[in-house]
Amino acid sequence: MYHNVGAPPRETAFRGLYVTPHMFTFQMWCLKASGFKVVPLKEILSFVKGDIFHENLASITFDDGYQDFYDNAYPVLKEYGYPSTVFLVSNLVGKENLWDHPKIHGRKKLMDWETIFRLREEGITFGSHTMTHPFLSKLSPMDMVDEIKNSKVLLESRLQAPVEFFCYPYGDYNNEIINVVKESGYIGAFTTRRGLVHRDDDFFEIPRSLIRNSTNPLLFVLRLCSNYEDRRKRTK
C-alpha cells in the first residue's frame, strides 16, 4: 500500500507516507528479483478462494489518487509491466487532499479526470476511497451510504467501467460499514491492517503492507519473503 511517490511539500510536517522515486524503483526491482508475480486485485481474491495456487503473488495499490502517481510511479510500473489499482476520492478528483490538516500533511494535488482517463487506457484500474475521505464510523447511516455507494456510482459513470473494489479511509470500518460496502455492489474491500493475505481471508477485510519512507531495503525484502509484516493490527 502506497500513498505518495515523490518529495513532500515544503510545509509538510508528517512525511512518513512519502517514498522517493529512487526507492520505489528499487522496490519494484525487488519484486521481480524475488520471483513475485504482480497481479490485478481480482487474482488476489482468487488466491483467497483457493482458485490460484501460486504462492508468490503481489498486488500494488495506491490510496487517494495523487498526481505523483502519474508523474513518478506509473512510468516505473509501465517499465516492469506491473498492473496496479488506485483508490480515488471521487468528489475531490482534480483538487487537493482537503481531508488532511494543511500544517501537518501539506496540500497535495490529486489527479484530474483527464489524467485518470489516460491511465485507464493504459490498463491502470481504479477503486473507490469514498466521496470525501471521512471517518466512516463517525457518519450518520445516510451519510455513510452516500460516501460508499455514490462514490461507486460517480466513478463508474465517469470511467465507463465497473468499480469493484473499495478501500476504507484511515482503515476505519466495522460490521455496519462492511455491510454497506457489500450492499453497494463491491466485490472486495481493502484495509490498512498490516499483514499478508491468507487463504480464507474475508473479502471485505483484506490486509495490506504499508510502505513508508522508513521502509528500507531490508524491511521491504523481509515483508516480501517472511511473516515479518503479518502482525494483524490496524494502522492509518
Cite the ranges covered by each PLM segment.
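Short, catalytically relevant binding-site loops at active-site mouths
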Residues: 91-94, 132-134, 172-173
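Histidine-centered catalytic micro-motifs
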Residues: 4, 125-133
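Surface-exposed cleft-lining segments at the edges of enzyme active sites
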Residues: 95-107, 134-141
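Acidic (Asp/Glu)-rich catalytic clusters
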Residues: 32, 75-82, 109-128, 182
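Alpha-helical scaffolding within the catalytic cores
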Residues: 45, 71-72, 102-121, 149-150
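Acidic/aromatic-lined carbohydrate-recognition and catalytic surfaces
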Residues: 54-58, 62-82, 89-93
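A short, conserved beta-to-alpha structural element at the edge of catalytic cores
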Residues: 47, 81-103
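C-terminal active-site subregion of NodB/CE4 polysaccharide deacetylases
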Residues: 1-61, 67-70, 138-236
